[in-house]
A protein has these predicted regions:
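Short S/T/G/P-rich N-terminal loop/turn motif that feeds into the first structured element of a domain
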Residues: 1-225
């Protein structure tokens, strides 16, 4: 077994990718102002006919020095660079003038990834759910392909033990040289509630601890497009 077996596209949805834009709250940030910003952003995306497949706001469960929230986008891979070139050239300055006092989008620090789905996709209330990222660094004398045996066992365990488990499991592979490119694997999961997250997260940590050094971050997600 080799590492190429990790990066197998199991999606039937075409060639898509995900990225996370760090955002900082401005002096005029409030819940109502954020809702207004979201509404204006969606209107702008529609007016310009940009094909954004999905957008989500992620609030970190623990305070981050790097961002106050993440703005997650899913796009067709072929459209991604075109979108950002047009946005930066034609819209970013005016957007920042209008909305920079509410939130600053750190578009020079985007984390972009190709998503490799694992296991079964399950229904999810996208208005309020949980995402977890496990950042995995290989221990000495271990190979990345070892994760596949555990991942298969994990999916079987979820099924046979009637554990609620994740609604989505994926391996994320960086598409550019950002700072999260230093990890050997990012294990990404979505969960319906905290009980499901806590139960599955412990199983994953126990199963991967012999292969990787791991640290995790958790966020509350809300779909906005």
């Amino acid at each position: 077994m080799n590492n190429s077996e990790i990066w197998v596209d199991n999606s039937d949805h075409g060639d898509w990718m995900v990225e996370f834009i760090p955002c900082k709250k401005g002096q005029n940030f409030s819940r109502d102002n954020l809702l207004d910003l979201i509404s204006c952003w969606n209107k702008k995306i529609d007016e310009e006919a940009y094909e954004i497949l999905m957008a989500v706001i992620l609030q970190p469960k623990e305070k981050s020095e790097e961002y106050d929230f993440l703005w997650q986008l899913e796009l067709w891979t072929k459209d991604r660079d075109i979108f950002w070139t047009e946005w930066r050239n034609n819209h970013e300055n005016s957007w920042n003038e209008d909305f920079g006092s509410i939130a600053t989008f750190l578009t020079d620090e985007i984390f972009d990834f190709k998503v490799y789905l694992r296991g079964e996709l399950k229904p999810l209330d996208e208005s309020n759910y949980h995402q977890e990222f496990k950042y995995c660094s290989l221990k000495k004398d271990h190979n990345l392909s070892e994760v596949l045996d555990f991942e298969n066992n994990y999916q079987n365990l979820i099924s046979t033990k009637k554990i609620k488990g994740s609604t989505l499991t994926a391996f994320l592979k960086p598409l550019s040289d950002h700072k999260l490119n230093n990890f050997d694997l990012i294990w990404h999961s979505c969960y319906e509630d905290l009980d499901a997250l806590d139960e599955s997260s412990k199983i994953i940590d126990e199963g991967l601890s012999s292969i990787f050094d791991i640290h995790s971050t958790q966020h509350v997600g809300k779909r906005i497009r």
